[in-house]
Amino acid sequence: MPSVLWILFDGGGDRPNGGKTPFHVAFKPTIDYLTSLGSCGLLDPISPGVRPGSDTAHLALFGYDPYKYYTGRGAFEALGAGIELRPGDVAFRTNLATVDSSGVVIDRRAGRYIAPEETRAVEEVMAKIGDEVAKRYGVEVVYKSTVEHRGVLVLRGPVSHKVSDTDPHKVGMPVAKAAPLGNDREAALTAEVVNYITARFTEAAGGLEINKARAASGRPPINAILLRGGGYMPAIEPVAEKYRVKAAAIAGVALIRGVAKAVGMDVYTAQGLGGTKDDVFDHAVKLAVELMGKYDVVFLHVKGTDSTSHDGDFQGKVAVIERLDKALAPYLDHLLKNYFIVTSDHATPVSIREHTGEPVPLTLYGPDVVPDDVAKFSELTCWRGALGRLRGIDIMPILASYLGLSEKFGE
């Protein structure tokens, strides 16, 4: 039986820059060849004009209505980081960041790269702050770094997810104060705890040896922690029950691993796949091809296209696309016997450096997929394809249908 290899370029969609996009410019003969034999279209990850987060977009792409199942990013980040959430736990996505002397954010990612010894120093600080919070508020704090500047913070105790973010989501703005979004005592306590952690981290960071070393090398200090997406783990019907599809995901980023786990996918990682713009994909693609013999759908997440977009790096984004395509090339004959789908979870235009709401290109190849006349995978070409304009939530039912796994609606 054939299976599906699904390549997802995170933030891969873009706007024309000088009349061209990274997908259009990139030399990607394998993807373009399969595109020429398949059917193309445009994809609204959620719905037209909606700027998706990576969390809500992946829920939709995996076949789950985010308006029904989304309870906050933090829970998926925690699950992907290997933290098993208990009932009542509230989790947040964190960014290590840089602020100036007045508390204004000047870099939401503290230069993005965080060395292993810097990660250890941050985790030691957070452990001490956690002890203070436990004594002061009776709330347990669990903190874990994930990739680069990213991390997860879990609060355990009489807490609530109904608090606002401290992350201002843009530079040039002060770190926000968490505020309760409800009238309950738990929300008020949670906001107080979050604000305490935020203030204490900046106080403690001033004396860290790692920041002296970073200053000496011209790197921005790690002197703030930004929290966002407070949430709890929702109850989700596994994808194997909802769509009768046995699925696996290969990802280096905690958020994507967490969403995949939450919907019941088996999750793998691979050498070279760390969730950065410098990822190398040979081992990940090899693993994906091997897993195709065991699963109906194998999903491979490529983070680098989003990271380079947020950095405004057009050529870097092109390079990520080309590295992935080069890794696919040795397996072309195998791919031709199976199904192959490529798309993005959202657009992150290099010129904007943020998620935007326009549709992204989509291509679907299969031995029995009716081809159209599109020969190149790009925003500038896929709009002419036979698939038309789809939503993210349409993808899994389409794949299940081609695999012969979907149930008939009606008699």
Swiss-Prot record:
- Key word DNA-binding present: no
Q: Which UniProt keywords apply?
A: Glycolysis, Isomerase
Biological process (GO) annotations held by this record are: glycolytic process
Q: Which E.C. number(s) belong to this protein?
A: 5.4.2.12
Pathway recorded for this protein: Carbohydrate degradation; glycolysis; pyruvate from D-glyceraldehyde 3-phosphate: step 3/5
Which Pfam families does the annotation name? Metalloenzyme, PhosphMutase
Role, per record = Catalyzes the interconversion of 2-phosphoglycerate and 3-phosphoglycerate.
Record-stated family? Belongs to the BPG-independent phosphoglycerate mutase family. A-PGAM subfamily.
Identification of the protein by name = 2,3-bisphosphoglycerate-independent phosphoglycerate mutase
In which organism is this protein found?
Pyrobaculum calidifontis (strain DSM 21063 / JCM 11548 / VA1)
Q: Tell me the lineage of the source organism.
A: Archaea, Thermoproteota, Thermoprotei, Thermoproteales, Thermoproteaceae
